[in-house]
Amino acid sequence: MRRLLYYLYYFPIGLPLFLISLVITTTTIIIACYLGFGDWASRWPGFVWSRLSLWLHWSPVKIIGAEHLPKKGETYVVIANHQSMFDIFVLYGHVQLPFKWVLKESLRHMPFIGKACEAAKFIFVDDSKVSSIASTMEQGKETLESGHSIFIFPEGSRTENGKVSKFKKGAFVMAHELNVPLLPITIDGAYDILPKHTWLPHPHRITLTIHAPISTKDYGDYPANIATTARESQKIISAPLQDNTTETL
């Protein structure tokens, strides 16, 4: 019955409001960046839109481990599992710190969103090009030096089945090379809202678990510590999930 009520609300009210807010938010970001308010634009319009989007989709968020959130002036490479497109709203709306996303190159071409991300100077990476990876490292360094943290999904893409996929090494190389700690975060429940290859969202509660920061230096010497840190991070992030399942580490 609750799902029926949700769809009776969603199509005439929730979905139109979501699309309108998308256009308003991305347009605001683009204009504000053009006028020189890039730091404000890269954070606050997306924060408000993310909170609104979760509310419009009847998907409340419970936060565990808020005491691990960075204090003012601290920068991190923030890593999280990638359950669905709603992960963006969860992190943007509930992890309140200055940051830049590291995004797949394909997202640059999304209507409205791609242009807004470009204007906000988010970092696009194409794993197939060595030059793109090198550019990502340089942009990451500039981002951290400017006082912004970096958000990365180390799986590289959304999960196909709800399990945590094997982590790629890019986030951990970046953390090591730039000498910043990693902040692991677990998202649980977003997969139930919108699994990959589906387009009709379902309301569901989300739990956001913020873990204690870790460092690549905790796991030995370079380069062996990169693979070890990736495996240990995957274990940390997977632990709070309800079925506690992961793909092969």
Residues covered by each model-derived region:
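Non-catalytic C-terminal accessory region of glycerolipid acyltransferases
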Residues: L4, A134-L249
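Glycine-rich phosphate-binding loop signature in dinucleotide/nucleotide-binding domains
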Residues: P70-G73, L144-S146
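A short beta-turn/loop motif at secondary-structure boundaries
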Residues: E67-K71, L200-P201
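Catalytic core of membrane glycerolipid acyltransferases/transacylases, capturing the structured
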Residues: L22-F47, W55-W58, K71-V130
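Short gly/ser/thr-rich secondary-structure transition/capping motifs
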Residues: H57-I64, I133-A134, A190-D192
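Generic preference for hydrophobic
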Residues: I63, V78, W101-V102, L208-I210
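Membrane-interfacial terminal anchoring regions of lipid-handling membrane enzymes
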Residues: M1-C33, W44, L69, A227-L249
